[in-house]
UniProtKB/Swiss-Prot annotation:
It is found in: Secreted. The presence of a 'disulfide through disulfide knot' structurally defines this protein as a knottin. This is Kappa-theraphotoxin-Cg3a 1. Belongs to the neurotoxin 10 (Hwtx-1) family. 44 (Jztx-4) subfamily. The keyword Secreted applies. It comes from the Eukaryota.
Length: 63
């Protein structure tokens, strides 16, 4: 009985952590991070990245 209670609490904690991560991931969809697919119909790259026309991925700007 004691082991079942511990497993239930750990499972519930894991479920809450995963639900939080999914929610955070959905709210970050405003701009694309490093190696994010960019281009027509896709979210724009975040301010510190540029969309590579050759690869169609967000990357660091070339100096």
């Amino acid at each position: 009985m004691k082991n079942t209670s511990i497993l239930f609490i750990l499972g519930l904690a894991l479920l809450l952590v995963l639900a939080f991560e999914v929610q955070v991931g959905e709210s970050d969809g405003e701009c694309g991070g490093f190696w994010w697919k960019c281009g027509s119909g896709k979210p724009a790259c975040c301010p510190k990245y540029v969309c590579s026309p050759k690869w169609g991925l967000c990357n660091f700007p070339m100096p």
